[in-house]
Amino acid sequence: MAIQSKYSNTQVESLIAEILVVLEKHKAPTDLSLMALGNCVTHLLERKVPSESRQAVAEQFAKALAQSVKSN
């Protein structure tokens, strides 16, 4: 999603691959997968982001997500 990242492509791709393996293991349909991933995002925001920054971080995440699926 991000244009510049402090994480390597290898780190990101490895984490994505592991998450997708879990979803495939559970034969999770798309709607369940999105629900679970969304709940993970909420969990991270609530526990790892200071309350005064949560709304802005959530909005930045949503904007980046929308941009990542936007048709060219």
Curated annotation (Swiss-Prot):
Superkingdom to which the source organism belongs: Bacteria
InterPro entries for this protein: UPF0352 (IPR009857), YejL_sf (IPR023202)
Database matches in Pfam families: DUF1414
UniProt family annotation: Belongs to the UPF0352 family.
Name assigned to this protein: UPF0352 protein SO_2176
Record lineage: Bacteria, Pseudomonadati, Pseudomonadota, Gammaproteobacteria, Alteromonadales
